[in-house]
Amino acid sequence: KGGFVLKNTPAEREEAILKSKKHYRRFISAMLEITDNIDVQGKVQTPGHVITYDDPDPYLVVAPDKGTADFSDIANEVSEKSGFWLGDAFASGGSIGYDHRKEGITARGGWECVKLHFSEMGRNVQTDTTSVIGVGDMSGDVFGNGMLQSKTIQLKAAFNHMHIFLDPDPDPESSWHERKRLFEMQGSTWTDYSTNLISSGGGVYERQAKSIELSPEVKDLLGTDEENLKGIEVVRRILQMDVDLLWLGGIGTFIKSDLESEFHVGDQANNEVRINSSECRVNVIGEGANLGLTQLARIEL
């Protein structure tokens, strides 16, 4: 696991992408400079300027993920130019590999588990109307692919680090087509969702909003009599909703044990929205993301 942080990111998206690619090259090059290699005779070569205390280890691969998901070709290009023994097999995906998002590998695998859980309850998530809440957005690999696996789901609420999406009574068919449109749109966000396709009382809001006026439909959806709630309070209410499925397709830990403190979870960004396992009322949790629940919360649920 590793990564880098861009400082003074340009406001323009295209400039930001160019800058991130430039520094990604530096990042990958720096890693390869201190990594053991294998020569054409099959012998391990250790970089001469590196002091090592462990055994030779020339096996290094990268799996570009969120933020760098389209950078596989860059990593492989750097690998080949550096003479690294894996060449263009260094990074997964890319133009000569498989595209995680295009193939939907993670989401499809996770959805098989969802189908199994529902079948054990005598239901078919592929044909039965199924109410869903989710973490993520349609531009994402796991969330986006997951929310296209069934045409009979009703995605009633979702959120990511920026936005909150509320759709109290969605039409399964038209909402599926709209999600597909967003999935195919480059860099879409929840704000790109056609407002005329959102059911009465719903909408898209900022997660950091100081106050969101709640319609009667949303009050009923969230189970509250409050007239207004902060964005983070709405997110908490979403996680507490009584629905069929919670689809975890975004980064963060959102459910912990009652016995755990926020400090023990180690995900400060979501401290204000996280719920305890005793507050979780969904029938099935589908996790295509990573660490959506703490281990103790999993055991309790």
For every predicted segment, state its role.
Residues 8-57, 61, 67-301:
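Non-transmembrane, aqueous-exposed alpha-helical and coiled segments at domain scale
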Residues 1-5:
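N-terminal amphipathic, basic-rich helices that act as targeting or association modules
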